[in-house]
Amino acid sequence: MKLWTGLFVSLIATGALVAPAMAQNAAKPAIVYSTGGKFDKSFNEGVSQGAQRFNKETGIAIAEFEPSNETQFEQAHRRFAQRGQDPIVAVGFSQAVALEKVAKEFPNVNFTIIDMVVPLPNVQSVTFKEHEGSFLVGVLAALASKSGKIGFVGGMDIPLIRRFQCGFEQGIKYANPKAELIANMTGTTPAAWNDPGRGAELAKGQFDRGVDVVYAAAGSTGIGVLQAAKDRGKLAIGVDSNQNHLHPGTMLTSMIKRVDLAAYNSFKAANDKSWKGGIAALGLKEGGVDWALDKDNEKLVTPEMKAKVDAAKADIISGKITVHDYMSNNACK
């Protein structure tokens, strides 16, 4: 079928090392990416980085599939399972229904899903406490803003993205109770993750209303938000992967989700014969989320700003600060 043309040509591999590693009854990992492409400079690319790390350390090839739309998820998982790939990593919450169906058909194959819970014994569900990481970048945004107006551009309007927004708003209000958040969602369908042009339009509309710092949690759509900030001389906050390098000088920071670690840990555990199903929720304490400070944004973050963000981080980890999770009650309160 056309869907599978070149599927197994797409491998993360290191050439000569692959055959010996595979001959030793090693793991045969695979990845089904989310829509938007492997090199989306965000979520998918973070998973790819984790896979590359595993491949570099072990020499084991990783089969990959980049779907063009969500209807391909189920067949991708089924074909990988039929070919003996294990574990199979599903990138993104939108694969949950397809993965659950296929995982029931193949109870002896292990699956890992990132960003959603599928309660089956052969599924490892890795979620993140995005509200905690978003709180930190909210603190930084409030400290960096001169206008007191801060923007948020989300992708698809779903509870998960509301979780980002809610955590961000709490961080803003923690640092500056008088600050105003102006928020927009890109859309209500999966297309909202892959529309940089619309992201740029929304960001520009916010800038016209006085926003001088904007946070994008919108997949590939966010690339347009970051570009618009550069074009207008405003500050932007990236998401999932460290996006600071995209526009040094206007990237205030990035809220990092260690999706790379989720993929790497799944592959490594399978290879070590220690893989287990269940649910893992990774927050600041677990090293699953954080904010990025490096050579590309260090000139934008004063020592005083860093100290305040680090103090908030320590207080969240200790329990002194509790960041409300929007998904606990579908409300930001």
Placement of each model-derived feature along the sequence:
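Bacterial N-terminal signal peptides that target proteins for export
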Residues: M1-F8
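A residue-level marker of the well-folded mature domains of exported/periplasmic proteins
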Residues: A23-K333
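Sec/Tat signal peptide C-region and signal peptidase I cleavage site
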Residues: L17-A23
